[in-house]
């Protein structure tokens, strides 16, 4: 009682009947680290720290006949979209990609998300401005526009359909930057139109 009398202090916490739910954004738990993403024609994808990229004096390692199709500045909180010739897309949170040195070969995307043997990457982009529209192009001249936000998913362990294709068709590109589209046929004819004419 003597101790309580001499050292008692008012309670600093409040006791309440109800429990307040605390919702955490999983994305906020991921360290925000700047990095470089390298994508190759054969489907190799790697994440490189900005330091490794800036200090490297060697070219990135590639398999014979392979070449780099895209190189992005990104954050570990971003996601990478990869589109395949079979009309599918892969949603790849960048933080799940192992960090390697710029000169290293990296891993084939099938080590992260399983794709078919005949499936190959035809386009790639970093998912940032989800209000943008993506235009998909097929070998047979089919076009389709989709809002980037529609590609965001919570489960990404397998490829998902971006566009439904006929058996003899395949996806050849996906692009967000074009205001106009120019199609050229194998017999030398071409068709030019504005992307706002695409449904």
Predicted regions and their residues:
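Short, structured "edge-of-domain" segments at secondary-structure transitions
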Residues: 1-199
């Amino acid at each position: 009682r003597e101790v309580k009398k001499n050292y008692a202090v008012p309670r600093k916490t409040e006791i309440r009947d109800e429990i307040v739910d605390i919702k955490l954004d999983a994305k906020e738990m991921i360290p925000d680290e700047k990095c470089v993403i390298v994508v190759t024609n054969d489907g190799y994808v790697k994440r490189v720290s900005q330091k490794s990229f800036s200090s490297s004096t060697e070219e990135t390692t590639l398999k014979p006949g392979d070449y780099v199709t895209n190189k992005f500045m990104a954050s570990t909180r971003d996601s990478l979209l990869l589109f395949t010739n079979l009309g599918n897309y892969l949603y790849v949170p960048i933080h799940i990609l192992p960090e390697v040195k710029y000169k290293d070969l990296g891993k084939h995307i099938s080590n992260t998300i399983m794709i078919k043997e005949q499936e190959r990457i035809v386009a790639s982009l970093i998912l940032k401005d989800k209000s943008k529209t993506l235009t998909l192009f097929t070998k047979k001249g089919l076009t389709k526009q989709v809002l980037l936000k529609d590609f965001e998913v919570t489960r990404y362990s397998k490829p998902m359909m971006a566009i439904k294709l006929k058996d003899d068709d395949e996806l050849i590109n996906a692009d967000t930057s074009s205001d106009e589209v120019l199609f050229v046929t194998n017999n030398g004819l071409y068709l030019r139109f504005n992307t706002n004419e695409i449904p």
